[in-house]
């Protein structure tokens, strides 16, 4: 799994333990000082010692030479062409990252679209004025209405001046799921109005959603997150092409 498939993510997003500086060789500490976050170490061939790091929002393999004074940075391949860095980075960097992101999204103020017992959950950062969010809502109807998928809309407001107020109106509705359904079903004819006075509790929910979006480095909607058949976190920016719907939503 590549981090680029997950969209840019802030280093601050992750709270997994890192190796303490005093446990690391000086050469590795020098890279720490340049911003590399060491997530763990792993065995490597020919006397090398591998370290899995996170740097500038990407997983990075570091290889300490046997003398402990030099570091090789990048992928290491064997004579069969196998990338020996891939599995350690997946285990030590990307897997914990996926769990952390999913857990953070679970705690947001999302609006459910579909049955609670649907076997597949899909999160999307959604703006009420976003035509591509509405397009994805339409695309997902067969999966949602059959009970196979629940979409979880993390409401934000970034497209127009009244977007935050409209998201607040949905979050403050007596039945947010019903309000969202009516808004999306109506499309351009939606009569959703922005709240002029937003309750403090709703404002806090919306602010938290916006903060997470910013923390994850996301700049547009819809930003869609789902788990593939192996449980790996994947993402899609924008309304997906029809041939990608099966990957995101599962079997129809």
Put a short name on every predicted segment.
Residues 68-95:
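A short, surface-exposed interaction/processing loop segment used at functional sites
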